[in-house]
Amino acid sequence: MILFKVMHLEFEKELLEIKEKIDRLLGLYRLGKEEVLSELDELRKKFKEKARKIYRDLSPWERVQVARHPKRPHTSDYIKYLIKDFEEVHGDTCYGDDKAVIAGFGYFRGKPVAVVGHEKGKDTKEKLERNFGMPHPEGYRKAIKVFKLAERYNIPVITFIDTPGAFPGIGAEERGQSRAIAESMLTMAFLKVPSVAVVIGEGGSGGALAFGVANRVCILENAYYSVISPEGCAAILWKDQSKVKEAAKALRLTAKDLKELGVVDCVIPEPYGAAHWSPRGTAMMVGMTLKKCLDELSKLTEEGVVRSRLEKFKNMGAFKIAS
């Protein structure tokens, strides 16, 4: 509980206080004090109502903060909760193994699937090993390898998107960062097997889009998907980092905006208003959505899978013809 207290967001203070009371009463209940049960139920109800109200009215910038919450579930969590007998694939057969990308095969609801996702890491050591979820070219090449294996063995693909962006270092550029991203997008676009992408946290620019060219693109309600971060946008347009709130609003990067714009196909609700309060519950919601999408896509032929995916992306966007 102390760890979470350090990590809470400003607008979560009231929730944290209620959660601490719930934890204290749970401790007493486990010691045999059954008289606290009614008070415990009342506090749980109060927590749900307060959470629903707080997260329903968040601004775009506040949703970005929730998407970046350090306790938010990562790709590794969704694999743990949803994928059985997961076997990770390592290396890109060219340069090395990028730990910012998890890729491999396992079983989802009894059927084989390929899984690829960004991984930020949880503690300081792992975050450094995972490069804070910012892939190098070898991470994207590893993903491409898994995409092609999935196609060869007729296995559907699931991707989890959660990155501030591809790593912009000199070494990454020298090893072909932009080309690796482009090849990942191209490979996904023409895969002959069904694919579903889920934005679970940050969806930052091309680094995210590399795993986002799927038949179905879903997003958790507090995740975001954008061409640039609010901080980057504020620095470029306003030359002022303090304008992040205005930038977040202007970018229309929230799940609600993206659904209205047709960029994503569905918005997945988060239990208690935010995924970090219930990682397992969030995983179950994601699992139900994945099953629905994969069941729908399984009815398509190989040609239909590719055609529907290409049509989906061709139909995105809007333009106005000047008279």
Curated annotation (Swiss-Prot):
Major location category of this protein: cytoplasm
Keywords (A to Z) from UniProt: ATP-binding, Cytoplasm, Fatty acid biosynthesis, Fatty acid metabolism, Lipid biosynthesis, Lipid metabolism, Nucleotide-binding, Transferase
Pathway(s): Lipid metabolism; malonyl-CoA biosynthesis; malonyl-CoA from acetyl-CoA: step 1/1
Catalytic activity: N(6)-carboxybiotinyl-L-lysyl-[protein] + acetyl-CoA = N(6)-biotinyl-L-lysyl-[protein] + malonyl-CoA
InterPro entries per the UniProt record, alphabetical: Acetyl_CoA_COase_a_su, ClpP/crotonase-like_dom_sf, COA_CT_C
Residues in CoA carboxyltransferase C-terminal domain copies: 35-296
Family matches, as Pfam families: ACCA
GO MF entries: acetyl-CoA carboxylase activity; ATP binding; carboxyl- or carbamoyltransferase activity
Gene3D superfamilies per the UniProt record, alphabetical: 2-enoyl-CoA Hydratase, Chain A, domain 1
EC number: 2.1.3.15
A GO cellular component entry from the record: acetyl-CoA carboxylase complex
Regions that span the bilayer: none
Subunit text: Acetyl-CoA carboxylase is a heterohexamer composed of biotin carboxyl carrier protein (AccB), biotin carboxylase (AccC) and two subunits each of ACCase subunit alpha (AccA) and ACCase subunit beta (AccD).
Function: Component of the acetyl coenzyme A carboxylase (ACC) complex. First, biotin carboxylase catalyzes the carboxylation of biotin on its carrier protein (BCCP) and then the CO(2) group is transferred by the carboxyltransferase to acetyl-CoA to form malonyl-CoA.
Name the UniProt record assigns to this protein: Acetyl-coenzyme A carboxylase carboxyl transferase subunit alpha
Organism: Aquifex aeolicus (strain VF5)
